[in-house]
Amino acid sequence: MKPGRRPILRLQNSKRVPPAPVRALFRAAGWTEDIAAYSPAQIRKLLRHSHLVLTAWNPKQELVGFASAVSDGVLCGLVQNLVVHPRYRRHGLGTRLLRQLAGTMTRQGIPCLYALGIRGPRARTFFRRVGFHPLRWDVFVRLAR
């Protein structure tokens, strides 16, 4: 994509995404130890169990953006993934995906959306710009061994 040009993209709200483009996008974005390493069956399961999945496709039908959230459907949700292909960054696609994700969850009656693991000043600025704010509490995690 040429610098300075806004891409013409199609956003889609659907869990029916083939696993191969999802893996390719995560690999291109440098997530090699995460979803890029998952099997097609694991990716299908991830999609199926997500509350909401948004994808962005370029005119060549290549997956260039992906956002997903998990939720209880009532009280809160969690941004699970937000990935934009490196060639499509800094053009507003991440903002569009996150705003649509948050807006859809709000329209579904889910009043609270969390985003965890936000690292670095650019990421924090990005999430603040889209309406998120930092919480002043500890977050605990239990990892399977």
Task: Describe the predicted segments one by one.
Residues 1-38:
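Short amphipathic alpha-helix that is part of the acyltransferase structural core
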Residues 17, 74, 121-122:
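Short alpha-helical
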Residues 41-60, 64-83:
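A conserved beta-strand-loop-helix scaffold within acyl/acetyltransferase catalytic domains
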Residues 75, 111, 133:
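Short acidic/polar active-site loop segments enriched in Thr and Asp
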Residues 84, 90-103:
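Conserved acetyl-CoA-binding loop-helix of GNAT-fold acetyltransferases
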Residues 105-118:
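Conserved GNAT acetyl-CoA-binding A-motif
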Residues 114-116, 128, 133-145:
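Conserved catalytic-core motifs of GNAT/GCN5-like acyltransferases
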